[in-house]
Amino acid sequence: MEDERGREHGGDAAQQKTPRPECEESRPLSVEKKQRCRLDGKDTDGSKFITSNGGDFSDPVYKEIAMTNGCINRMSKEELRAKLSEFKLETRGVKDVLKKRLKNYYKKQKLMLKESNAVDSYYDYICIIDFEATCEEGNPAEFLHEIIEFPVVLLNTHSLEIEDTFQQYVRPEVNSQLSEFCIGLTGITQDQVDRADAFPQVLKKVIEWMKSKELGTKYKYCILTDGSWDMSKFLNIQCQLSRLKYPSFAKKWINIRKSYGNFYKVPRSQTKLTIMLEKLGMDYDGRPHSGLDDSKNIARIAVRMLQDGCELRINEKLHGGQLMSVSSSLPVEGAPAPQMPHSRK
């Protein structure tokens, strides 16, 4: 769900020689030098840039990467698209996204040449979850949100394909009658939730489905959400209402809004689902506030970010019932194998 209800969420490249950028300095001008940089022999206008040659980045490959980045920074949007097209990369998106995409392509190629045996740091699978919950217009503070749609989209990070999906509606028990606002927003009808199972039964089905995919046993995986509220609020409250302990597999997750903002260097205000799609050159596919459709669109953003060179990592967790950030510098870890949580006493 997004924030209309007043909340935050609502070929083997290593075998190829990477083109090395060349910079030719012209004669010095009065104060500063000017350069003409070339990517694959094609000129782009530019001015002087400075690189560091100390510390861990003293290896020549990092100097090459810095030179390449300087050239890319001075390319026009048309030049960026032409270069991306040449490498058969996605050409949609705003200029800053295109620059980031091209920079990460060159960086990845150069580092692969430097360390041909580099280990893939991604999870095998990412489970995208975007709950829909009961709601009322104005989002009153005392209202208890109950999950009414539990979708899961299984994204294979190696093939970058959606491998499978799960979806079940959930029968609310505290506020069993959906508000007209909720029906209009989510498209979920009273009849659909009346005929659905209660949350504990649906959670059991979700866990059985995840086990059938060998998540946490054969394959490393993690949860990904669009914001913090799905896990820290909706699932947390629902487990309390259903007298269940919070499931261990959902205690840590990737908040894609944080990942997107940090990777593309954009403010929090530009990390809403529809804005992220727009900035990446994509349109929303499906019905907004359908949990399954939202999850599929979030998966599309995750795929584009992985293609652009982002290492999606767990960045949030629930600890002692409190939402906390997780440092991106920590080693990549997967979620534990899913197990049905015990009942609360």
Curated annotation (Swiss-Prot):
Question: Which cellular compartments is it found in?
Answer: Cytoplasm; Nucleus; Nucleus, Nucleolus
Detail which positions bind Mg(2+) 1. D130, E132, D294
Region annotation (Disordered) ranges: 1-40
Chief location: cytoplasm
- Where are the Phosphoserine residues found in this chain? S58
Where does the SAP domain lie?
A: 72-106
SMART domains from the UniProt entry: EXOIII, SAP
- Give start and end of each Exonuclease domain: 126-302
Biological role stated in the UniProt entry: RNA exonuclease that binds to the 3'-end of histone mRNAs and degrades them, suggesting that it plays an essential role in histone mRNA decay after replication. A 2' and 3'-hydroxyl groups at the last nucleotide of the histone 3'-end is required for efficient 3'-end histone mRNA exonuclease activity and degradation of RNA substrates. Also able to degrade the 3'-overhangs of short interfering RNAs (siRNAs) in vitro, suggesting a possible role as regulator of RNA interference (RNAi). Required for binding the 5'-ACCCA-3' sequence present in stem-loop structure. Able to bind other mRNAs.
PANTHER family in alphabetical order: 3'-5' EXONUCLEASE ERI1-RELATED (PTHR23044), 3'-5' EXORIBONUCLEASE 1-RELATED (PTHR23044:SF61)
Q: What is this protein called?
A: 3'-5' exoribonuclease 1
